[in-house]
Protein backbone atom coordinates (compact mmCIF):
# COMPACT_ATOMS: atom_id res chain seq x y z
CA UNK A 1 0.00 0.00 0.00
CA UNK A 2 1.61 3.28 -1.14
CA UNK A 3 -0.11 5.58 1.36
CA UNK A 4 -1.72 5.59 4.81
CA UNK A 5 -4.49 8.05 4.28
CA UNK A 6 -4.66 11.55 5.68
CA UNK A 7 -1.55 11.10 7.84
CA UNK A 8 0.75 11.01 4.82
CA UNK A 9 0.61 14.72 3.95
CA UNK A 10 1.57 16.02 7.41
CA UNK A 11 4.27 13.34 7.67
CA UNK A 12 5.92 14.35 4.39
CA UNK A 13 5.69 18.04 5.29
CA UNK A 14 7.16 17.35 8.73
CA UNK A 15 10.10 15.50 7.24
CA UNK A 16 10.71 18.30 4.75
CA UNK A 17 10.65 20.88 7.54
CA UNK A 18 13.49 19.09 9.35
CA UNK A 19 15.48 18.90 6.07
CA UNK A 20 15.12 15.17 5.56
CA UNK A 21 14.47 16.00 1.89
CA UNK A 22 16.96 18.36 0.26
CA UNK A 23 16.83 19.73 -3.26
CA UNK A 24 19.77 21.05 -5.27
CA UNK A 25 22.79 19.23 -6.69
CA UNK A 26 24.24 16.37 -4.66
CA UNK A 27 26.81 13.71 -5.43
CA UNK A 28 25.60 10.29 -4.34
CA UNK A 29 27.78 7.46 -3.02
CA UNK A 30 27.77 6.00 -6.54
CA UNK A 31 29.31 9.19 -7.91
CA UNK A 32 26.10 10.12 -9.69
CA UNK A 33 24.93 13.71 -9.38
CA UNK A 34 21.35 13.92 -8.09
CA UNK A 35 18.88 16.84 -7.76
CA UNK A 36 17.54 15.37 -4.52
CA UNK A 37 19.15 14.03 -1.37
CA UNK A 38 17.21 12.13 1.29
CA UNK A 39 18.67 11.89 4.77
CA UNK A 40 16.46 10.64 7.59
CA UNK A 41 19.19 10.22 10.19
CA UNK A 42 18.25 13.47 11.89
CA UNK A 43 14.86 12.21 13.04
CA UNK A 44 16.51 10.29 15.90
CA UNK A 45 16.80 13.67 17.65
CA UNK A 46 13.08 14.37 17.20
CA UNK A 47 11.21 11.77 19.28
CA UNK A 48 7.72 12.77 18.15
CA UNK A 49 8.61 12.58 14.46
CA UNK A 50 10.52 9.35 15.00
CA UNK A 51 7.45 7.78 16.61
CA UNK A 52 5.21 9.11 13.84
CA UNK A 53 7.40 7.52 11.15
CA UNK A 54 7.62 4.24 13.05
CA UNK A 55 3.84 4.10 13.60
CA UNK A 56 3.23 4.75 9.90
CA UNK A 57 5.62 1.97 8.89
CA UNK A 58 3.90 -0.48 11.24
CA UNK A 59 0.44 0.56 10.03
CA UNK A 60 1.57 -0.04 6.44
CA UNK A 61 2.59 -3.58 7.39
CA UNK A 62 -0.77 -4.13 9.09
CA UNK A 63 -2.68 -2.81 6.08
CA UNK A 64 -0.75 -5.17 3.80
CA UNK A 65 -1.75 -8.16 5.94
CA UNK A 66 1.84 -9.31 6.43
CA UNK A 67 2.44 -12.18 8.82
CA UNK A 68 5.79 -12.04 10.65
CA UNK A 69 7.44 -13.11 13.89
CA UNK A 70 10.37 -10.70 14.22
CA UNK A 71 11.52 -7.35 12.85
CA UNK A 72 14.95 -6.28 11.62
CA UNK A 73 15.95 -2.76 10.56
CA UNK A 74 18.50 -2.26 7.81
CA UNK A 75 21.58 -0.69 9.43
CA UNK A 76 21.88 2.04 10.36
CA UNK A 77 19.11 4.62 9.88
CA UNK A 78 16.31 2.05 10.10
CA UNK A 79 17.54 0.61 13.41
CA UNK A 80 15.86 3.22 15.64
CA UNK A 81 12.67 2.89 13.56
CA UNK A 82 12.64 -0.88 14.10
CA UNK A 83 13.35 -0.35 17.80
CA UNK A 84 10.34 1.94 18.26
CA UNK A 85 8.08 -0.42 16.28
CA UNK A 86 9.12 -3.43 18.36
CA UNK A 87 9.00 -1.64 21.70
CA UNK A 88 5.58 -0.10 21.03
CA UNK A 89 4.00 -3.27 19.67
CA UNK A 90 5.85 -5.85 21.80
CA UNK A 91 7.48 -7.60 18.83
CA UNK A 92 10.85 -9.39 19.08
CA UNK A 93 13.61 -7.50 17.30
CA UNK A 94 16.80 -8.63 15.59
CA UNK A 95 19.83 -6.45 14.88
CA UNK A 96 21.97 -7.07 11.82
CA UNK A 97 25.53 -5.83 12.05
CA UNK A 98 27.26 -4.41 9.00
CA UNK A 99 30.44 -6.19 9.97
CA UNK A 100 31.25 -9.16 12.18
CA UNK A 101 32.71 -8.39 15.60
CA UNK A 102 36.25 -9.70 16.10
CA UNK A 103 35.50 -10.37 19.76
CA UNK A 104 32.75 -11.93 21.89
CA UNK A 105 30.18 -13.98 19.95
CA UNK A 106 31.38 -12.65 16.55
CA UNK A 107 27.77 -12.78 15.31
CA UNK A 108 26.32 -10.82 12.40
CA UNK A 109 22.79 -11.02 13.81
CA UNK A 110 22.01 -10.21 17.44
CA UNK A 111 18.85 -11.32 19.21
CA UNK A 112 16.93 -14.56 19.67
CA UNK A 113 16.90 -16.45 16.37
CA UNK A 114 14.37 -19.22 15.82
CA UNK A 115 15.03 -20.87 12.44
CA UNK A 116 11.88 -21.15 10.35
CA UNK A 117 10.35 -17.92 11.65
CA UNK A 118 9.57 -14.98 9.36
CA UNK A 119 11.40 -11.68 9.78
CA UNK A 120 10.02 -8.39 8.46
CA UNK A 121 12.66 -5.95 7.20
CA UNK A 122 12.31 -2.21 7.88
CA UNK A 123 14.11 0.37 5.71
CA UNK A 124 14.00 4.16 5.45
CA UNK A 125 14.71 4.65 1.72
CA UNK A 126 14.98 2.17 -1.15
CA UNK A 127 16.79 3.01 -4.37
CA UNK A 128 18.20 -0.13 -6.00
CA UNK A 129 17.08 -2.45 -3.19
CA UNK A 130 20.62 -3.68 -2.53
CA UNK A 131 20.67 -2.82 1.19
CA UNK A 132 17.41 -4.67 1.83
CA UNK A 133 18.68 -7.62 -0.19
CA UNK A 134 21.96 -7.75 1.75
CA UNK A 135 20.06 -7.78 5.04
CA UNK A 136 17.69 -10.47 3.77
CA UNK A 137 20.60 -12.69 2.73
CA UNK A 138 22.19 -12.41 6.18
CA UNK A 139 18.90 -13.29 7.89
CA UNK A 140 18.26 -16.19 5.53
CA UNK A 141 21.67 -17.65 6.33
CA UNK A 142 20.49 -17.77 9.95
CA UNK A 143 17.55 -19.94 8.89
CA UNK A 144 14.93 -17.18 8.87
CA UNK A 145 12.35 -16.51 6.17
CA UNK A 146 12.16 -13.08 4.54
CA UNK A 147 9.09 -12.43 2.41
CA UNK A 148 8.37 -8.73 2.87
CA UNK A 149 10.03 -5.38 3.51
CA UNK A 150 8.48 -2.07 4.56
CA UNK A 151 10.08 1.17 3.42
CA UNK A 152 9.20 4.75 4.23
CA UNK A 153 10.15 6.08 0.79
CA UNK A 154 10.53 4.22 -2.50
CA UNK A 155 12.66 6.29 -4.90
CA UNK A 156 11.12 4.33 -7.81
CA UNK A 157 14.48 3.51 -9.35
CA UNK A 158 14.04 -0.23 -9.74
CA UNK A 159 14.40 -1.41 -6.15
CA UNK A 160 10.91 -2.89 -5.95
CA UNK A 161 11.47 -4.97 -9.09
CA UNK A 162 14.88 -6.13 -7.92
CA UNK A 163 13.49 -7.32 -4.60
CA UNK A 164 10.51 -8.96 -6.29
CA UNK A 165 12.97 -10.90 -8.47
CA UNK A 166 14.45 -12.30 -5.25
CA UNK A 167 11.08 -13.20 -3.74
CA UNK A 168 10.71 -10.17 -1.47
CA UNK A 169 7.63 -7.94 -1.65
CA UNK A 170 8.33 -4.25 -1.04
CA UNK A 171 5.59 -2.15 0.58
CA UNK A 172 6.16 1.61 0.67
CA UNK A 173 4.59 4.24 2.87
CA UNK A 174 5.22 6.76 0.11
CA UNK A 175 6.76 6.90 -3.34
CA UNK A 176 9.03 9.68 -4.47
CA UNK A 177 6.41 10.80 -7.01
CA UNK A 178 3.79 11.12 -4.27
CA UNK A 179 6.21 13.00 -2.04
CA UNK A 180 6.93 15.51 -4.83
CA UNK A 181 3.21 15.93 -5.43
CA UNK A 182 2.57 16.69 -1.75
CA UNK A 183 5.45 19.15 -1.46
CA UNK A 184 4.41 20.96 -4.64
CA UNK A 185 0.82 21.22 -3.39
CA UNK A 186 2.15 22.64 -0.12
CA UNK A 187 4.26 25.12 -2.17
CA UNK A 188 7.44 23.79 -0.58
CA UNK A 189 8.98 23.21 -4.03
CA UNK A 190 8.17 24.53 -7.50
CA UNK A 191 7.20 22.75 -10.71
CA UNK A 192 10.69 23.11 -12.16
CA UNK A 193 12.20 21.23 -9.21
CA UNK A 194 9.58 18.51 -9.55
CA UNK A 195 10.41 18.16 -13.23
CA UNK A 196 14.16 17.93 -12.60
CA UNK A 197 13.75 15.20 -10.00
CA UNK A 198 11.31 13.20 -12.10
CA UNK A 199 13.60 13.35 -15.14
CA UNK A 200 16.52 12.20 -13.02
CA UNK A 201 14.54 9.26 -11.66
CA UNK A 202 13.32 8.23 -15.11
CA UNK A 203 16.84 8.39 -16.54
CA UNK A 204 18.46 6.46 -13.69
CA UNK A 205 16.57 3.24 -13.15
CA UNK A 206 18.50 0.22 -11.91
CA UNK A 207 18.11 -2.98 -13.90
CA UNK A 208 16.93 -5.95 -11.89
CA UNK A 209 17.70 -9.56 -12.72
CA UNK A 210 16.06 -12.90 -11.99
CA UNK A 211 17.88 -15.61 -10.07
CA UNK A 212 19.05 -17.07 -13.39
CA UNK A 213 20.64 -13.74 -14.33
CA UNK A 214 18.19 -12.77 -17.07
CA UNK A 215 17.15 -9.10 -16.90
CA UNK A 216 13.65 -8.02 -16.04
CA UNK A 217 11.78 -5.75 -18.42
CA UNK A 218 12.40 -2.40 -16.73
CA UNK A 219 14.09 0.62 -18.22
CA UNK A 220 17.87 0.53 -18.21
CA UNK A 221 19.77 3.64 -17.20
CA UNK A 222 21.34 5.30 -20.21
CA UNK A 223 25.10 5.09 -20.53
CA UNK A 224 27.04 8.20 -19.72
CA UNK A 225 27.95 10.40 -22.67
CA UNK A 226 31.51 10.11 -23.94
CA UNK A 227 33.77 13.15 -24.13
CA UNK A 228 33.31 13.28 -27.90
CA UNK A 229 29.51 13.12 -27.59
CA UNK A 230 29.51 15.88 -24.97
CA UNK A 231 31.65 18.03 -27.27
CA UNK A 232 28.78 18.04 -29.79
CA UNK A 233 26.02 19.07 -27.38
CA UNK A 234 24.13 22.09 -28.74
CA UNK A 235 24.63 24.22 -25.60
CA UNK A 236 28.25 23.31 -24.92
CA UNK A 237 30.66 26.21 -24.44
CA UNK A 238 33.16 26.48 -27.35
CA UNK A 239 36.16 26.21 -25.01
CA UNK A 240 34.68 23.14 -23.31
CA UNK A 241 33.92 21.61 -26.71
CA UNK A 242 37.48 22.20 -27.90
CA UNK A 243 38.89 20.68 -24.72
CA UNK A 244 36.66 17.60 -24.88
CA UNK A 245 37.58 16.98 -28.51
CA UNK A 246 41.30 17.13 -27.89
CA UNK A 247 40.88 14.93 -24.80
CA UNK A 248 39.20 12.30 -26.95
CA UNK A 249 41.77 12.66 -29.74
CA UNK A 250 44.80 12.40 -27.44
CA UNK A 251 43.15 9.97 -25.00
CA UNK A 252 44.10 12.08 -22.02
CA UNK A 253 42.17 13.73 -19.20
CA UNK A 254 45.29 14.81 -17.35
CA UNK A 255 46.01 18.44 -16.44
CA UNK A 256 49.57 19.20 -15.38
CA UNK A 257 49.86 21.62 -12.47
CA UNK A 258 53.12 23.33 -13.42
CA UNK A 259 53.65 25.22 -10.17
CA UNK A 260 57.30 26.09 -10.77
CA UNK A 261 59.18 29.31 -10.09
CA UNK A 262 61.39 29.51 -13.20
CA UNK A 263 60.14 30.20 -16.72
CA UNK A 264 62.67 27.84 -18.28
CA UNK A 265 61.38 24.92 -16.21
CA UNK A 266 57.79 25.82 -17.11
CA UNK A 267 58.55 25.73 -20.83
CA UNK A 268 60.60 22.53 -20.54
CA UNK A 269 57.74 20.77 -18.77
CA UNK A 270 55.22 22.03 -21.34
CA UNK A 271 57.34 20.77 -24.23
CA UNK A 272 58.23 17.41 -22.71
CA UNK A 273 54.82 16.55 -21.24
CA UNK A 274 52.58 18.36 -23.72
CA UNK A 275 51.74 15.19 -25.69
CA UNK A 276 50.48 13.52 -22.48
CA UNK A 277 48.21 16.28 -21.19
CA UNK A 278 45.00 18.02 -22.19
CA UNK A 279 45.72 21.13 -20.15
CA UNK A 280 48.56 22.90 -18.39
CA UNK A 281 47.78 24.83 -15.21
CA UNK A 282 49.92 27.82 -14.30
CA UNK A 283 50.46 30.06 -11.29
CA UNK A 284 52.21 32.95 -13.00
CA UNK A 285 52.50 34.97 -9.81
CA UNK A 286 55.09 32.49 -8.50
CA UNK A 287 57.32 32.82 -11.57
CA UNK A 288 60.44 34.77 -10.62
CA UNK A 289 61.16 35.75 -14.22
CA UNK A 290 57.72 36.20 -15.77
CA UNK A 291 57.47 38.03 -19.08
CA UNK A 292 54.79 38.10 -21.74
CA UNK A 293 57.35 36.63 -24.15
CA UNK A 294 57.45 33.53 -21.95
CA UNK A 295 53.69 33.19 -22.29
CA UNK A 296 53.95 33.61 -26.07
CA UNK A 297 56.36 30.66 -26.10
CA UNK A 298 53.92 28.70 -23.94
CA UNK A 299 51.10 29.44 -26.40
CA UNK A 300 53.28 28.12 -29.24
CA UNK A 301 53.90 24.90 -27.32
CA UNK A 302 50.19 24.59 -26.49
CA UNK A 303 49.31 24.79 -30.19
CA UNK A 304 52.05 22.33 -31.13
CA UNK A 305 51.08 19.71 -28.56
CA UNK A 306 47.35 20.50 -28.45
CA UNK A 307 46.64 21.42 -24.87
CA UNK A 308 44.86 24.37 -23.25
CA UNK A 309 46.38 26.84 -20.80
CA UNK A 310 44.61 27.32 -17.47
CA UNK A 311 45.74 30.11 -15.14
CA UNK A 312 44.87 29.14 -11.57
CA UNK A 313 44.29 32.76 -10.51
CA UNK A 314 41.31 32.12 -8.22
CA UNK A 315 39.74 35.55 -8.71
CA UNK A 316 37.84 36.61 -5.60
CA UNK A 317 37.05 40.31 -5.69
CA UNK A 318 34.31 42.64 -6.90
CA UNK A 319 33.55 42.71 -10.62
CA UNK A 320 35.38 45.93 -11.47
CA UNK A 321 38.55 44.78 -9.71
CA UNK A 322 38.70 41.29 -11.24
CA UNK A 323 38.09 42.81 -14.66
CA UNK A 324 41.26 44.88 -14.29
CA UNK A 325 43.20 41.96 -12.81
CA UNK A 326 42.17 39.75 -15.73
CA UNK A 327 42.92 42.07 -18.66
CA UNK A 328 45.67 44.31 -17.30
CA UNK A 329 48.46 44.56 -14.80
CA UNK A 330 51.80 42.85 -15.28
CA UNK A 331 50.37 39.47 -16.27
CA UNK A 332 47.63 40.39 -18.80
CA UNK A 333 46.11 36.96 -18.15
CA UNK A 334 43.27 37.26 -20.65
CA UNK A 335 45.75 37.60 -23.51
CA UNK A 336 47.16 34.09 -23.10
CA UNK A 337 45.03 31.89 -20.78
CA UNK A 338 42.22 29.82 -22.31
CA UNK A 339 40.71 29.30 -18.87
CA UNK A 340 40.78 30.97 -15.48
CA UNK A 341 38.96 30.20 -12.25
CA UNK A 342 37.11 32.15 -9.59
CA UNK A 343 35.67 31.85 -6.11
CA UNK A 344 31.93 32.47 -5.77
CA UNK A 345 32.24 34.31 -2.43
CA UNK A 346 31.91 37.80 -4.03
CA UNK A 347 28.68 36.82 -5.78
CA UNK A 348 27.83 36.89 -9.47
CA UNK A 349 29.71 40.17 -9.96
CA UNK A 350 32.98 38.27 -10.12
CA UNK A 351 31.75 36.30 -13.14
CA UNK A 352 30.21 39.34 -14.80
CA UNK A 353 33.46 41.27 -14.48
CA UNK A 354 35.52 38.43 -15.91
CA UNK A 355 33.20 37.71 -18.80
CA UNK A 356 33.24 41.33 -19.95
CA UNK A 357 36.88 40.70 -20.77
CA UNK A 358 36.83 37.00 -21.57
CA UNK A 359 33.78 36.59 -23.80
CA UNK A 360 35.07 38.70 -26.72
CA UNK A 361 38.35 36.73 -26.53
CA UNK A 362 36.55 33.36 -26.54
CA UNK A 363 37.82 32.44 -23.07
CA UNK A 364 36.16 30.39 -20.34
CA UNK A 365 35.94 30.27 -16.56
CA UNK A 366 35.80 27.52 -13.94
CA UNK A 367 34.07 28.13 -10.61
CA UNK A 368 35.58 26.72 -7.44
CA UNK A 369 32.82 24.53 -6.01
CA UNK A 370 34.96 22.36 -3.72
CA UNK A 371 38.59 22.30 -2.59
CA UNK A 372 40.91 19.42 -1.73
CA UNK A 373 42.35 20.91 1.47
CA UNK A 374 41.47 19.81 4.99
CA UNK A 375 38.86 22.03 6.64
CA UNK A 376 37.72 23.64 3.39
CA UNK A 377 34.52 25.67 3.75
CA UNK A 378 33.60 25.05 0.11
CA UNK A 379 30.94 22.46 0.90
CA UNK A 380 27.16 22.15 1.16
CA UNK A 381 25.32 25.40 0.46
CA UNK A 382 28.49 26.99 -0.88
CA UNK A 383 28.86 24.25 -3.50
CA UNK A 384 25.20 24.49 -4.47
CA UNK A 385 25.56 28.26 -4.85
CA UNK A 386 28.50 27.71 -7.19
CA UNK A 387 26.41 25.37 -9.35
CA UNK A 388 23.56 27.88 -9.54
CA UNK A 389 25.97 30.65 -10.51
CA UNK A 390 27.45 28.48 -13.25
CA UNK A 391 24.01 27.71 -14.65
CA UNK A 392 23.13 31.41 -14.66
CA UNK A 393 26.33 32.30 -16.54
CA UNK A 394 26.83 29.28 -18.79
CA UNK A 395 27.79 31.56 -21.68
CA UNK A 396 31.15 32.03 -19.90
CA UNK A 397 31.41 29.39 -17.16
CA UNK A 398 32.49 26.00 -18.53
CA UNK A 399 32.60 23.97 -15.33
CA UNK A 400 34.00 23.52 -11.84
CA UNK A 401 37.01 22.89 -9.71
CA UNK A 402 35.61 20.23 -7.39
CA UNK A 403 36.34 16.96 -5.66
CA UNK A 404 33.53 15.19 -7.49
CA UNK A 405 30.71 15.76 -9.94
CA UNK A 406 28.54 18.56 -8.56
CA UNK A 407 26.28 19.21 -11.57
CA UNK A 408 24.14 16.86 -13.61
CA UNK A 409 24.55 18.91 -16.77
CA UNK A 410 26.96 17.18 -19.20
CA UNK A 411 27.88 20.57 -20.68
CA UNK A 412 29.86 21.38 -17.52
CA UNK A 413 33.37 20.03 -16.95
CA UNK A 414 34.67 18.89 -13.57
CA UNK A 415 38.37 19.24 -12.75
CA UNK A 416 39.75 17.73 -9.56
CA UNK A 417 43.06 18.66 -7.89
CA UNK A 418 44.72 16.73 -5.10
CA UNK A 419 45.27 13.54 -7.10
CA UNK A 420 48.04 10.99 -6.62
CA UNK A 421 48.30 7.34 -7.59
CA UNK A 422 48.04 6.46 -3.90
CA UNK A 423 45.64 8.23 -1.52
CA UNK A 424 47.15 10.26 1.31
CA UNK A 425 48.01 13.83 2.29
CA UNK A 426 50.76 16.29 3.18
CA UNK A 427 51.62 18.28 6.30
CA UNK A 428 49.88 21.41 4.98
CA UNK A 429 46.40 19.96 4.79
CA UNK A 430 46.33 18.78 1.17
CA UNK A 431 44.32 15.59 0.74
CA UNK A 432 45.06 13.19 -2.13
CA UNK A 433 42.77 10.75 -3.92
CA UNK A 434 43.56 8.26 -6.68
CA UNK A 435 42.53 8.71 -10.35
CA UNK A 436 40.16 5.74 -10.06
CA UNK A 437 38.44 7.30 -7.05
CA UNK A 438 38.16 10.76 -8.61
CA UNK A 439 37.24 9.81 -12.19
CA UNK A 440 35.73 6.35 -11.83
CA UNK A 441 33.73 6.77 -8.63
CA UNK A 442 33.21 10.49 -8.04
CA UNK A 443 32.41 11.34 -11.65
CA UNK A 444 35.00 14.04 -12.30
CA UNK A 445 36.35 14.55 -15.83
CA UNK A 446 39.93 15.76 -15.48
CA UNK A 447 42.58 15.13 -12.83
CA UNK A 448 44.99 17.93 -11.89
CA UNK A 449 48.40 16.58 -10.88
CA UNK A 450 51.45 18.58 -9.83
CA UNK A 451 53.96 17.19 -7.37
CA UNK A 452 53.18 13.59 -8.30
CA UNK A 453 54.69 14.31 -11.72
CA UNK A 454 57.09 17.21 -11.23
CA UNK A 455 58.82 15.61 -8.22
CA UNK A 456 59.23 12.24 -9.96
CA UNK A 457 62.65 11.02 -11.09
CA UNK A 458 61.23 10.62 -14.60
CA UNK A 459 58.53 13.25 -15.21
CA UNK A 460 57.44 11.83 -18.56
CA UNK A 461 57.07 8.32 -17.18
CA UNK A 462 55.08 9.65 -14.23
CA UNK A 463 52.84 11.73 -16.51
CA UNK A 464 52.10 8.69 -18.65
CA UNK A 465 51.21 6.67 -15.56
CA UNK A 466 48.72 9.32 -14.47
CA UNK A 467 47.36 9.73 -18.00
CA UNK A 468 46.74 6.01 -18.38
CA UNK A 469 45.20 5.67 -14.91
CA UNK A 470 42.81 8.58 -15.46
CA UNK A 471 41.85 7.49 -18.97
CA UNK A 472 41.20 3.91 -17.90
CA UNK A 473 39.04 5.19 -15.03
CA UNK A 474 37.04 7.25 -17.55
CA UNK A 475 36.60 4.22 -19.84
CA UNK A 476 35.46 2.08 -16.91
CA UNK A 477 32.85 4.73 -16.10
CA UNK A 478 31.55 4.41 -19.64
CA UNK A 479 31.45 0.64 -19.29
CA UNK A 480 34.01 0.20 -22.07
UniProtKB/Swiss-Prot annotation:
The modification N-acetylalanine is found at residue 2. PROSITE patterns: OMPDECASE, PUR_PYR_PR_TRANSFER. GO terms for molecular function: orotate phosphoribosyltransferase activity; orotidine-5'-phosphate decarboxylase activity. The modification Phosphoserine is found at residue 214. Pfam families: OMPdecase, Pribosyltran. Signal peptide: none annotated. The keyword Phosphoprotein applies. It catalyses: orotidine 5'-phosphate + diphosphate = orotate + 5-phospho-alpha-D-ribose 1-diphosphate; orotidine 5'-phosphate + H(+) = UMP + CO2. The modification Phosphotyrosine is found at residue 37. SMART domains: OMPdecase (SM00934). Keywords: Acetylation, Decarboxylase, Glycosyltransferase, Lyase, Multifunctional enzyme, Phosphoprotein, Pyrimidine biosynthesis, Transferase. Pathway: Pyrimidine metabolism; UMP biosynthesis via de novo pathway; UMP from orotate: step 1/2; Pyrimidine metabolism; UMP biosynthesis via de novo pathway; UMP from orotate: step 2/2. UMP binds at residues 257, 259, 281-283, 317, 321, 372, 430-432, 450-451. Orotidine 5'-phosphate binds at residues 257, 281, 314, 317, 321, 372, 430-432, 450-451. Its EC number is 2.4.2.10, 4.1.1.23. Residues 221-480 are annotated as: OMPdecase. The active site is at 314 (for ompdecase activity), 317 (for ompdecase activity). Bifunctional enzyme catalyzing the last two steps of de novo pyrimidine biosynthesis, orotate phosphoribosyltransferase (OPRT), which converts orotate to orotidine-5'-monophosphate (OMP), and orotidine-5'-monophosphate decarboxylase (ODC), the terminal enzymatic reaction that decarboxylates OMP to uridine monophosphate (UMP). Homodimer; dimerization is required for enzymatic activity. In the N-terminal section; belongs to the purine/pyrimidine phosphoribosyltransferase family. In the C-terminal section; belongs to the OMP decarboxylase family. PANTHER family: OROTATE PHOSPHORIBOSYLTRANSFERASE (PTHR19278), URIDINE 5'-MONOPHOSPHATE SYNTHASE (PTHR19278:SF9). HAMAP family: PyrE (MF_01208). This is Uridine 5'-monophosphate synthase. The lineage of its organism: Eukaryota, Metazoa, Chordata, Craniata, Vertebrata.
